[in-house]
Amino acid sequence: MNNLKYSTQTISKKDIISVSKVLKSELLTQGPVTIKFENKIKNLAGSKYALAVNSGSSALLLACKALSLKPGDLFWTVPNSFVATANCGILCGLKIDFVDIDNDTWNISIEKLENKLKIAKKKGKLPKLIIAVHLGGLPVNPLKLKKLSKKYKFKIIEDASHSFGGKYYLRKVGCSK
């Protein structure tokens, strides 16, 4: 029987020494290493800003809070992601609904999203936010998502926890550009 690993990591001796050095320093979370790390992440992600946090869950919550949405506003995401993707909106007082996934990529189905948006527009119940997950290293088509965002006036959070550093053609995943 073959065992399939969900994920693997490579941690070198240099990594261990670097982490140990920070752990022994006076400034664990707000020191020069954190600033250097944030600058590297900013460059890697192709974003204007970067903020180091303890987890992807915290990053999603901060992103959601930064949008200044109102309690009761509607947001949509996928049903097959880690619970933090849904929880971040709920913790901000938003109401959740789900969009079905693409059977080939397991990401949000752009086609099903567009159909759901058309129906929601007729009912006057459009979402203020879509949280798209780039699941398992397979990115959502950001160009189509952005086009729908402009047409239906919703904000986008890209959860790139599974695809960090990835690209969709030449566009870096997760920067909502």
Where are these regions (language model features)?
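Structured binding elements
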Residues: 93
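Short beta->alpha connector loops at strand-helix junctions that form conserved
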Residues: 79, 97-103
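Structural detector of well-ordered beta-strand residues that form the stable sheet scaffold
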Residues: 76, 97, 156-157
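Conserved coil-to-alpha-helix start sites within the AMP-binding
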Residues: 81-86
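A short beta-strand submotif of the Rossmann-like class I SAM-dependent methyltransferase core
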Residues: 52, 77, 129-132
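Phosphate-binding glycine-rich loop
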Residues: 27-74, 88-90, 98-100, 122
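N-terminal "arm"/small-domain region of PLP-dependent enzymes with the aminotransferase-like
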Residues: 1-27, 32
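Active-site phosphate-binding strand-loop segment of PLP-dependent enzymes
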Residues: 104-177
